[in-house]
Amino acid sequence: MDLDTITSISTPMGEGAIGIVRLSGPQAVEIADKLYKGKHLLNDVPSHTINYGHIIDPESKEVVEEVMVSVLRAPKTFTREDIIEINCHGGILTINRVLELTMTYGARMAEPGEFTKRAFLNGRIDLSQAEAVMDFIRSKTDRASKVAMNQIEGRLSDLIKKQRQSILEILAQVEVNIDYPEYDDVEDATTEFLLEQSKEIKQEINRLLDTGAQGKIMREGLSTVIVGKPNVGKSSMLNNLIQDNKAIVTEVAGTTRDVLEEYVNVRGVPLRLVDTAGIRETEDIVEKIGVERSRKALSQADLILFVLNNNEALTQEDYTLYEVVKNEDVIVIVNKMDLEQNIDINEVKDMIGDTPLIQTSMLKQEGIDELEIQIRDLFFGGEVQNQDMTYVSNSRHISLLKQARQTIQDAIDAAESGVPMDMVQIDLTRTWEILGEIIGETASDELIDQLFSQFCLGK
């Protein structure tokens, strides 16, 4: 593939120990040699070596930076192109100057995700693996990163390719029977054969979809909203779960005036914890904005932690709030058990019915383990599945698998109703195409461009 040479800073902007300028393309080594002065020309050193030297401004002859330069030659690189990585000191000024020099002498500034896009276009990875690279970068827990790494390694791709190959074998068998019915040595593509094979493919698609809910939680985190009247201990609960003091905790009702969000790993389940402003009528403009954001967070939540105050009797406000959330996945928490009990637990149980109930003291850190176990049990049946299994975690993949399941079902229905084989082929072919979109073999250029535009610069 005839592409130009791209360049970008591939480390986070800001001061640090090192900063890396990455080049990829046919002129990567040549451009670097125009700037680099060391013991040997980079063009003469072996691949996959690191070389000490300096970056020199060819025009002024000024020493710009002391560097270590990695030389990686095609095709055994991430992009399958020549790659140069210039390791600089981590100052913002010098690394930007090195970047500018690479562009002055022939490289083009890379677009977001363009290095990974080239890896895809050059056949190094498929589209699902490319998407997993971004998932890996954005992962908030060990489990999420492991799920992403499994996809980078191609586990999902292998399963998709296997099903596409099975469909091709069915189509080939049907095609031969239609075009060459006189051949005695060709196995008959009977309706029974087609149904058996198609149902096996559908079963495998269903198996992948069965991992979708948990996979999406692994990837995005379980959106968990902490809700309750003002000053029942919601922010203290957030702080105990994340072991941090991000939320403001005071004795004044209404001090959480916005939606605070944090990721935390709870017994293998990644939670995206959201502490909301108390939902109540208020004249305070700032607090009113927080209340509206809280309502929006509630509507998008996977799990709601509904907090009550052990020190106060149930009020109409508690009943009203519970009415808002009762049809969702809810765990009710009676907090502040270290204080005098003024709440009627039996009244609470009458209000919530079979909804799980946990009693806690955030001040004494009591009941937190029980709460964490209840969260795990509610979504993973008491056991978080093996992180080495193949999860489908990407919403795009889940949507396409659902479409593929429908089209393979259409093929099954058509075959069972006696529709001619050449008509059944249409649904089988469409299933093959949809599965191909997951790994990028039948994806449009527009989709590919859109997906890679979401990547960070330098990746």
Swiss-Prot record:
Spell out the GO cellular component terms annotated for this protein, sorted alphabetically and separated by semicolons. Answer: cytoplasm; cytosol
Name of the protein this chain belongs to = tRNA modification GTPase MnmE
Positions of (6S)-5-formyl-5,6,7,8-tetrahydrofolate binding: 22, 85, 124, 459
- What is the stated purpose of this protein? Exhibits a very high intrinsic GTPase hydrolysis rate. Involved in the addition of a carboxymethylaminomethyl (cmnm) group at the wobble position (U34) of certain tRNAs, forming tRNA-cmnm(5)s(2)U34.
Give the subcellular location: Cytoplasm
Binding-site residues for Mg(2+), renumbered to this chain: 235, 256
Reported EC number(s) for this entry are: 3.6.-.-
Q: What is its main location?
A: cytoplasm
* Any Gene Ontology biological process: tRNA wobble uridine modification
Where is each TrmE-type G domain found?
Answer: 221-380
Q: How is the cofactor bound?
A: Binds 1 potassium ion per subunit.
* Organism in which the protein naturally occurs: Staphylococcus aureus (strain NCTC 8325 / PS 47)
Q: Which positions bind GTP?
A: 231-236, 250-256, 275-278
Cofactor(s) needed for function? K(+)
Gene transcribed to yield this protein = mnmE
Similarity-based family: Belongs to the TRAFAC class TrmE-Era-EngA-EngB-Septin-like GTPase superfamily. TrmE GTPase family.
| Residues annotated for K(+) binding in this entry | 231, 250, 252, 255
* UniProt keyword terms in alphabetical order: Cytoplasm, GTP-binding, Hydrolase, Magnesium, Metal-binding, Nucleotide-binding, Potassium, tRNA processing
